[in-house]
From Swiss-Prot:
Subunit structure: Octamer.
Organism: Bacillus subtilis (strain 168)
Cited Pfam families: YonK (PF09642)
Protein name as it appears in the record: SPbeta prophage-derived uncharacterized protein YonK
């Protein structure tokens, strides 16, 4: 198998499709990323796309 070079970007936060932004909330600050600009780096390239949603599981006995 030939070697390969991987160009990968990971962004985690709340996605707003109307404005194509992802907002990441950390303990220190809030960061907003231009998702359309990020995707433009891959324009015309052969890509693999994965979208994942994460939710915390409810804890038994806690409301």
């Amino acid at each position: 198998m030939a070697s390969k070079k991987v160009h990968q970007i990971n962004v985690k936060g709340f996605f707003d499709m109307d404005v194509m932004e992802v907002t990441e909330q950390t303990k220190e600050a809030e960061y907003t990323y231009d998702f359309k600009e990020i995707l433009s780096e891959f324009n015309g390239k052969n890509v693999s796309i994965t979208v994942k949603e994460e939710n915390e599981l409810p804890v038994k006995g806690v409301e």
